From Swiss-Prot:
<feature type="transmembrane region" description="Helical">
    <location>
        <begin position="568"/>
        <end position="588"/>
    </location>
</feature>
<feature type="topological domain" description="Extracellular">
    <location>
        <begin position="277"/>
        <end position="298"/>
    </location>
</feature>
<dbReference type="GO" id="GO:0016324">
    <property type="term" value="C:apical plasma membrane"/>
</dbReference>
<dbReference type="InterPro" id="IPR004841">
    <property type="entry name" value="AA-permease/SLC12A_dom"/>
</dbReference>
<comment type="subunit">
    <text>When phosphorylated, interacts with PPP3CB.</text>
</comment>
<dbReference type="Pfam" id="PF00324">
    <property type="entry name" value="AA_permease"/>
</dbReference>
<dbReference type="GO" id="GO:0071475">
    <property type="term" value="P:cellular hyperosmotic salinity response"/>
</dbReference>
<dbReference type="GO" id="GO:0071918">
    <property type="term" value="P:urea transmembrane transport"/>
</dbReference>
<keyword id="KW-0406">Ion transport</keyword>
<feature type="topological domain" description="Extracellular">
    <location>
        <begin position="435"/>
        <end position="546"/>
    </location>
</feature>
<feature type="transmembrane region" description="Helical">
    <location>
        <begin position="606"/>
        <end position="626"/>
    </location>
</feature>
<feature type="modified residue" description="Phosphoserine">
    <location>
        <position position="116"/>
    </location>
</feature>
<feature type="glycosylation site" description="N-linked (GlcNAc...) asparagine">
    <location>
        <position position="442"/>
    </location>
</feature>
<keyword id="KW-0769">Symport</keyword>
<feature type="topological domain" description="Cytoplasmic">
    <location>
        <begin position="219"/>
        <end position="255"/>
    </location>
</feature>
<feature type="transmembrane region" description="Helical">
    <location>
        <begin position="414"/>
        <end position="434"/>
    </location>
</feature>
<dbReference type="InterPro" id="IPR002443">
    <property type="entry name" value="SLC12A1/SLC12A2"/>
</dbReference>
């Protein structure tokens, strides 16, 4: 395929690439014909002003593809036949390169969002489809997995609008009418006609131009940042709100979006009042006042805003036409001023200070001459609002044909043109008009009179008395200087009308558009009413009327001098955040930050953000404080509400970079006992199936350690991997929704023990590796298959082999609530079926069908399936409201026992063996938690009866050095005595079914029994560890005596030496040790210190 440079010139596209599209046709013969002629291409190129941009070539004979491209600007087909999900039989996939392959060539449809209005999203063949063995009639669900996994979905409200929209009749604007015109009109405000002459009179030409350039620097940097963000992907409607929210996230976007929309709504009132004041001045001159100045402003303002609302509601096309007419009037007014500067002035104008271009006047006005109370920054504060308005085009981003191209071109060109105009007007008016003039033609200088050396004196006028008394004319005194200088004064008045009305109209359109986008994202609950759009252009009519009400309210107040500085600061706050967004996205180094507009710099953007914040305080410090307070309040509100959106913001990207940097930094830090914290692997299976196990672990890892909920999928890898992958996101989401600070990890393995081994070795990252294994006690060990028992005890051995501590948790009812969840699932399915039937009834107008199905519902009501089932991902406590029947309500209550606040009680710590201190550290951490803070620690340790007091003092001293508070210390001196006969008999009856009794057999028979049942407990083994068995039984007696009323018991876990103690005997030890007790934690550290008393 050849590549050539486009030669012709037509309007440019937003794409930055050269692309050749070859249509292979629908017939295979055309694709593989041996005698096919060399391809001939019909070329379509898009603009010589943008080299290395889009160039597309089509084969002849495919007019449909060519027409589709001209309409949408995209190179790929949008035929709905490509939605066929049976990609094994879809011939499109088999023709990607003209030979038999399911792999698809790159297409734009694969990268669209689900609700894209430019065309439907197409699902590429999944990895499983092209990797698994080929099977007939394999179908893929309509939702592609890669969309969910990579988070390129859209908010729920946009998904609800996922429809094929008829685009005919939709009005879209190019960069000139959509951005350039609007920005120029908004930047050229009344300041150009009635305040610029005063500014240059106060600051002089030098500082006046500096003020203009400083303002331009702020807006130019913001324009560059806006351009970079706008070209980093497809831009929807919403303007500044959309740019900020998709860059920094909903917290910043939501807070600035609301105040930005409000600022635009109030700005409508400000501009309309400015227009009304000018009209009232004209009425005063002609002595045609209606009531009084204040009420006349209200009457004229109200009528004006009603007319502007009518233009806006009529549609964007009418509003755009009105803007073009107003721009023409404004340009004529500006041209009229420049023409007036070269028309020789008459005596009346000279007496008012206008002498045409004079070098002496230019020299005199070049330096500053600040009056009392004015300075550089005060004058700058007055001028800067005139430079704003650069987001007028971006605010209607949803109505632009190509926002990525229009926003940068229109905004930057508008800034350049308006800046040149401001500087030109400032220099010209300062070169023609003196600062002070009396307006009296009698002040001419008669020959022979002394001259004070001023420029006016040299030109024949003596305005020296203006130094002692106020004068009415000149740059410093007359706000109508431009009207006086112009060739035809009424045109300047028309220009003022044009500037105020165009700015009001732009704000009246911007506010509803931004507010509609904010409401669509549903960040602020309750504002969804204003998200609805009407007509082809999705016009926010409800937003228009809301803006009208706000504008009308402030017009009727007619006191805008107080609110004006706050509104200016609202705009500046949005500029600051746009600059910060650009910096933040660059600093986060996300691969997704790839703006097509490369003329920006992250540090310049940061400087622009700081500059905007500084200008806010320069303009009005108290208004800046109010702006920050309001924005902070809204930010905190949105953060607290946590809107369910995922926009891939730079905040998320920076979180990843920070986490990565910190994890890497952590690898350089050596382990120290003072920094030890429990980092736990918890074998919960699915987190929702064993909530109590997760709750107790989370209690001592929350905010202080790592918690990984692990699940092992046992079985054929092919089946297990599919099941595992399908549920990982859902289970992690369950943890997040239930506010459990933990990760979810899963592995697929041939057996449970192999999976746990993999988790023990590979889980974690760097220093954040697990050091503790938490498992639930296997309550059904006597009924479980032998292989399960071997795996259970085996993973304890494996943990010790990897030098990982072990915590076994036992509660009386057990942990697994899967039976309850199964009932819940069944109820949910029944509820869904019921709702589906009800929906069918509403759609079906047949009375017979209604009666028959409703009869079924009455019967179903008796079965209790008409009540909505509780949500599965809710708190486990909600399950209690279900009708679980025979599925053991006690199990449900037990599963939620660690969610509740523990009353006043004790945590009894039986620190029998020194394991490095983990047995003591875990209960101490528990007492720091809100739910356990009312529980006191009671410490139990073994000792000699003859030295109880000495050992008690010694242990108290050790705990004091560890800085661990305790309520009491008990030294148990009778641990090693034999247990009661009744207790020992219970233990013997427990192990009886598993004993070999080989000592009563001859040697041959005994050896045979050992070979046939190697898992059974031999007499020799039982005799060898008899003292240890006595100890376990005796400990249970002591626990029953001392800790039966405790809230929690933490007990040293006995260790079974490998090869010496069988699995069944070890489980019997754990059973008899923890039998008939409150919740128990059996803890054994890795015998490395986790406590220290050194500083």
């Amino acid at each position: 395929m050849s590549v050539s440079i486009p030669s012709n010139s037509v309007p440019s596209s937003a794409s930055r690439f050269q692309v050749h599209v070859i249509n292979e046709g629908h017939g295979s013969a055309a694709a593989v014909g041996d005698s096919a002629d060399p391809p001939h291409y019909e070329e379509t190129s898009f603009g010589d002003e943008a080299q290395n941009r889009l160039r597309i070539s089509f084969r002849p004979g495919n007019q449909e593809c060519y027409d589709n491209f001209l309409q949408t600007g995209e190179t790929a087909k949008t035929d709905t036949t490509f939605h066929a999900y049976d990609s094994h039989t879809n011939t499109y996939y088999l023709q990607t390169f003209g030979h038999n392959t399911m792999d698809a060539v790159p297409k734009i449809e694969y990268y669209r969002n689900t609700g894209s209005v430019s065309g439907p999203k197409v699902n590429r063949p999944s990895l499983l489809e092209i990797h698994e063995q080929l099977a007939k009639n394999v179908t893929v669900a309509p939702g592609s997995a890669d969309r969910v996994a990579n988070g390129d979905g859209m908010p729920g409200d946009e998904q609800a609008e996922n429809k094929e929209e008829d685009m005919t009749g939709v009005v879209k604007f190019g960069w000139v009418k959509g951005v350039l015109v609007r920005c120029m009109l908004n930047i050229w405000g009344v300041m150009l006609f009635i305040r610029l002459s005063w500014i240059v009179g106060e600051a002089g030409i030098g500082l006046g131009v500096l003020i203009i350039l400083l303002s331009t620097m702020v807006t130019s940097i913001t324009g560059l940042s806006t351009s970079a963000i706008a070209t980093n992907g497809f831009v929807r409607g919403g303007g500044a709100y959309y740019l900020i929210s998709r860059s920094l996230g909903p917290e910043f976007g939501g807070s600035i979006g609301l105040i930005f929309a409000f600022a635009n709504a109030v700005a409508v009132a400000m501009y309309v009042v400015g227009f009304a004041e000018t009209v009232v001045d004209l009425l005063k001159e002609s002595d045609s006042m209606m009531v009084d100045p204040t009420n006349d402003i209200r009457i004229i303002g109200s009528i004006t805003v009603v007319i502007l609302l009518g233009i806006s509601v009529a549609g964007m096309e009418w509003e755009a036409k009105a803007q073009v007419i107003l721009l023409v009037i404004l340009l004529i007014a500006i041209a009229n001023f420049f023409i007036g500067t070269v028309i020789p002035s008459n005596n009346e104008k000279k007496s008012r200070g206008f002498f045409n271009y004079q070098a002496s006047i230019f020299a005199e006005n070049f330096g500053p001459s600040f009056t009392k109370g004015e300075g550089f920054f005060s004058v700058f504060a007055i001028f800067f609002p005139a430079a704003t308005g650069i987001l007028a085009g971006a605010n209607i981003s949803g109505d632009l044909e190509d926002p990525q191209d229009a926003i940068p071109r229109g905004t930057m060109l508008a800034i350049f043109i308006t800046t040149v105009a401001y500087i030109g007007v400032a220099i010209c008016v300062a070169a023609c008009v003196v600062r002070d003039a009396t307006g009296s033609m009698n002040d001419t200088i008669v020959s022979g009179m002394n001259c004070n050396g001023s420029a006016a004196c040299g030109l024949g006028y003596d305005f020296s008395r203006c130094q002692h008394e106020p004068c009415q004319y000149g740059l410093m005194n007359n706000f109508q200087v431009m009207s006086m200088v112009s060739g035809f004064g009424p045109l300047i008045t028309a220009g003022i009308f044009s500037a105020t009305l165009s700015s009001a109209l732009a704000s009246l359109v911007s506010a509803p558009k931004v507010f509609q986008a904010l409401c669509k994202d549903n960040i602020f609950k309750g504002l969804q009413f204003f998200a609805k759009g009407y007509g082809k252009n999705n016009e926010p009519l409800r937003g228009y009327f809301l803006t009208f009400v706000i504008a009308m309210a402030f017009i009727l107040i007619a006191e805008l001098n107080v609110i004006a500085p706050i509104i200016s600061n609202f705009f500046l706050a949005s500029y600051a955040l746009i600059n910060f967004s650009c910096f933040h996205a660059s600093y986060a180094k996300s691969p997704g930050w790839r703006p097509a507009y490369g003329i920006y710099n992250m540090w310049v953007s940061l400087f622009g953000a700081i500059l905007c914040c500084a200008v806010m305080f320069v303009i009005n410090w108290w208004a800046a404080v109010i702006t920050y307070v309001i924005e902070l309040f809204l930010y905190i509100y949105v953060t607290y509400k946590k809107p369910d959106v995922n926009w891939g913001s730079s905040t998320q990207a920076l979180s990843y970079v920070s986490a990565l940097d910190n994890a890497l930094e952590l690898t350089t830090v050596e382990d120290h006992v003072k920094n030890f914290r429990p980092q736990c692997i918890v074998l919960t299976g699915g987190p929702m199936t064993r909530p109590a196990l997760l709750d107790i672990t989370h209690a001592f890892t929350k905010n202080s350690g790592l918690c990984i909920c692990c699940e092992v999928f046992v079985g054929p890898r092919k089946l297990c991997v599919k099941e595992m992958n399908s549920g990982m996101a859902k289970k992690q989401a369950w943890l997040i929704k239930n506010k459990i600070k933990a990760f979810y990890a899963a592995v697929a393995a041939d057996c449970f023990r192999d999976g746990v081994r993999s988790l023990l070795q590979a889980s974690g990252l760097g220093r954040m590796k697990p050091n503790t294994l938490v498992i639930g006690y296997k309550k059904n060990w006597r009924k479980a298959p032998l292989s399960e028992l071997e795996n259970y005890v085996g993973i304890i051995h494996d943990a010790f082999d990897f030098e990982i501590g072990v915590v076994i948790v036992r509660i009386s009812q057990g942990f697994d609530i899967s039976p309850v969840l199964q009932v819940q699932d069944e109820l949910e399915k029944l509820e869904q079926e019921r709702l589906a039937l009800e929906a069918a009834i509403k759609d079906n107008e047949c009375e017979e069908g209604k009666g028959g199905i409703r009869g079924l519902f009455k019967k179903a009501g008796k079965l209790n399936i008409t009540k909505p089932a509780p949500k599965k991902d809710g708190n486990i406590s909600s399950i209690q409201s279900m009708h679980v029947g025979e599925f053991n309500q006690k199990l449900v209550e037990a599963s939620a026992q660690f969610k509740k606040k523990q009353g006043k009680g004790t945590i009894d710590v039986w620190w029998l063996f020194d394991d490095g201190g983990l047995t003591l550290l875990i209960p101490y951490i528990l007492t720091l938690r809100k739910k356990w803070k009312d529980c006191k620690l009671r410490i139990y340790v073994g000792g000699k009866i003859t030295r109880i007091e000495e050992e008690k003092i010694s242990m108290a001293s050790l705990l004091s050095k560890f800085r661990i508070k305790f309520a009491d210390i008990h030294i148990i001196g009778d641990i090693n005595i034999k247990p009661n006969k009744e207790s020992w008999k219970v233990f013997e009856e427990m192990i009886e079914p598993y004993r070999l009794h080989e000592s009563h057999k001859d040697l041959t028979t005994a050896e045979k029994l050992k070979r046939e049942s190697p898992w059974k407990i031999t007499d020799a083994e039982l005799e060898a560890v008899k003292e240890k068995s006595y100890r376990q039984v005796r400990l249970n007696e002591l626990l029953q005596e001392h800790s039966r009323a405790a809230n929690l018991i933490v007990l040293s876990l006995p260790v079974a030496r490998k090869g010496s103690i069988s699995d069944l005997l070890y489980m019997a030890w754990l059973e008899i040790l923890t039998k008939n007790l409150p919740p128990v934690l059996l803890v054994r550290g890795n015998h490395k210190n986790v406590l220290t008393f050194y500083s």
